[in-house]
C-alpha cells in the first residue's frame, strides 16, 4: 500500500501515500493568462498544473485528478489514460496540465485530489487526497443550485388556439 504520511498544503494537512518512484512536487491553479490563483468564476478558463519528479525511468505512468465539492461529493475524476494520452517513459522533472476552457462549476469551495499510478492503476506512486483547495466565487453566473452550469438554452413557444 505504500507509505502513509501527513503532508502540508497551504497550512492544511492531507493524506498522502505511495511508493515514491515519482513524486508530486507541486500543484498550481492557473487562469487564462497563466497566472496562479485560488479562486475563479463559473465560465472562466482554468488550468491545473501538476509538477513531478521521476526518480527513475517509469513506463506509461497515469496522471489523475479528482475534484470534490466541500461536502465531499465528487464532481469528476479524469486521468491521462482515459484521455488517450500516451505518456511514454518519464524520468526526472516534468509537468502535466489539465486545461478546462469553460469551467462549469457553481460557486462554493472545492478540493482537488491528484495522483500518479502505474499503467494498470494497481500501484500508487504518489497520491494527495483532497489536498488542494480552490474556490468558485459569484459573478460568473446567476445560477446557485447544484454542481454545474449546463451549456443549455431555453426555447419557449406559446400555445395558440
List each language-model region with its residue ranges.
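Localized sequence-composition bias
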Residues: 1-161
